Amino acid sequence: MGYRSDVAYTIRFVHDDDTNNKQSFYTFLAEAKANAATAACFNEEAKEWSEFVVDEAKHRINFHADHVKWYESYADVQCHEALLSLAKEWDEDEDNNSGIAYVFVRIGEDNDDIEEKSGGDWDYDWVNVERSISRDW
């Protein structure tokens, strides 16, 4: 069976100038699709076990998968990690005025296994962890 995780991330362009968002978004998409490490994220086969949406109207990429084996040795996981690394590179480039922001959250089966990464001017409501109690009554 293996260890399972729930995973979600979003990459967004949130510059005040919407024209800048559009240009940056499509430049980022072109770079990601041309890069061997990230291109597979955009293949239809990769979407069979997860939700991967390129939202052109809102200049964002959203990903969500429940109960998956999120092992760093898996090619599909490496692709998504590479896409997040590309977003981080864009965010950390001082000459880049793209307005990129991203948030990644992975929750493992163990209660203390939570991984979070973020960058840019992100909003807490995009992706976050909420604790709750389930009951059968």
Regions found by a protein language model. Give the residues of each.
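Charged interaction segments
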Residues: 30-137
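Short, extreme N-terminal segment that most often corresponds to the first beta-strand
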Residues: 1-31
